[in-house]
Amino acid sequence: MYPYNPHSQRAEEFINHEEILETLAYAEENKHNIPLIDSIIEKAKLRKGLSHREAMVLLDCDIPEKNEEIYALAKQIKQDFYGNRIVMFAPLYLSNYCVNGCVYCPYHAKNKHIRRKKLTQEEIVREVTALQDMGHKRLALETGEDPVNNPIEYVLESIQTIYSIKHKNGAIRRVNVNIAATTVENYRRLKDAGIGTYILFQETYHKESYERLHPTGPKHDYAYHTEAMDRAMEGGIDDVGIGVLFGLELYRYEFAGLLMHAEHLESVFGVGPHTISVPRIRHADDIDPSAFDNGIDDDTFAKIVACIRVAVPYTGMIVSTRESQESRERVLSLGVSQISGGSSTSVGGYYEKEAEEDNSAQFDVSDNRTLDEIVKWLMDLGYVPSFCTACYREGRTGDRFMSLCKSGQIQNCCLPNALMTLKEYLIDYAAPKTKEIGEKLILEEIKSIPKEKIQEIVRKNLVEIEKGNRDFRF
C-alpha cells in the first residue's frame, strides 16, 4: 500500500485509492454541513481553486439552495475566465487499427464487425480540405494504438501533412493529438512537430476496474497510462488535456481522481491541465452503453461540470458531439469553453460520407448539426464562436498561458482574436443568415474589449479581413 502523495510521480501515490475512499466518505458525511459548504463556496469565490475534498463536498451536496449557489458561481467563474467565447474544433480520425482490448470501445482488437481503415497521406489531404471548407482551424487527431499500422512516424508525417494544406483561405493552425501513452522521447518528437495540446483520457482512475476494462494490450498497464502526462511534460509538451469516460466506474470516484490528477500536475510541474474533457459512454458498433452500470443522468452531468469549473477555474473544458444539443446548451454556461462541431467519428468520414455497412466510427454522434448550424446556434444564445489558435502560435502555453488566464489578462487577447477569427469564418464559409447575425454580434462585442487601443486595432484588422487578408492575432 502506497501513501497519498501529490508530489510523487508514482501513479498509485498521486492517484491514491485510500485517499479517494476517504474523500468520498468525508463528502458523504458533510454533504449537509451548511457551515462547511458555505466556507467552501466562499473559498471558491477567490477564483484560486479547491482541493479534491472540498470539491467533492460540493458535488455531493443535495441542498437545493446551495446547489443554486454552486451553479451561479460556476457561471460567474466561467464568465470571468473565458467570457462568452466558445472555441470550435473537430476530431480527425486517422486510423482505427488497434491492438488493445478495451471493452467499451469498438476499436478493440477482437471486434471483427468494424471495417479497419488507415488514411494515406493523400486521403488526409482530402479530409483536411473538407474540414477547411467547413471553416475549421483546429483539429484533434485520433488514432488507435497499433505499433505496426500507426507508429509514431505515421502520426508525425500526418501532422506535417495537415499543417501544409492551404485550400482557398483555409488553414489548420493548431493540431492537438489524442494518441496512446508513449515515451518521453516520442512526446519530444510530438512537441517538435508543433502539436498544440496532448490529450489522453484516463478512462477510469479506479485501478482494479481499469485493469478489468483493459484486459489485453499495452493499455492494460495502469501505471504507464496514468503517468503519461508526467512523461509528456518531461518531453516538453506544455499543454496537456485530461479526462475520464463517465459511465465506466462510479462518477464520484472518477471526479475525485480527476481533480487529484490536476492537483498532481500543478504540484509537480507548476501548471495544471490545459483542458479537462467530460465524455460519457455512448453507443457504438459492438458496444451497448446499457451494459455499463455507472451511467450518469443529465442533472448529474451538469453538476459535475459546474463543480469542475469551480474547483479548477483556469482550465478549458470540452464537450464533444457525444452530447446532444440540449445537454451541450445546459453545460455551456456552467463551465464548458470548447466544443466540437460538424464532427465525424469515422476514419475518412469528412470527404466521403460512410455507408452504414462500412461503419468505422468510434461512437455514435448525438449532435449531428453542421458546423454552420452550430455557429449560428451559439450566436443565437449570445456566445462568440472562436476559431482562435493564437496562444499556441504566440508561445502562450503552459505556465505562461496559466499566469495570463489566472490574472484575467488573457481577456485582452482572447476576445479580439475570437472576433477576428469569427469574421474570417463569416466571410469565407457562413450561410447568409449566419453571416448577418455574426456581423451584428461582432459590432456589439468589440465594445466589450477592455482597452480602447486594442478596440481600434481590431476595427482596422476587420477592414483588412474584408479586403481578403487573413490571420491577424494578438
Language-model-derived ranges and their functions:
Residues 109-126, 130-232, 239-248, 270-277, ...:
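Core AdoMet radical
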Residues 90, 128, 156-163, 187, ...:
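Generic structural signal for well-ordered alpha-helices
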Residues 143, 197, 202, 223-287, ...:
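Conserved C-terminal portion of the radical SAM core fold
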Residues 82-83, 87-123:
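Canonical Radical SAM [4Fe-4S] cluster-binding loop centered on the CxxxCxxC motif
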Residues 351-369, 374:
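C-terminal helical cap(s) of enzyme catalytic domains, especially alpha/beta-barrels
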Residues 1-89, 388-389, 393, 416, ...:
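Flexible, acidic/Gly-rich N-terminal and inter-domain linker regions that tether
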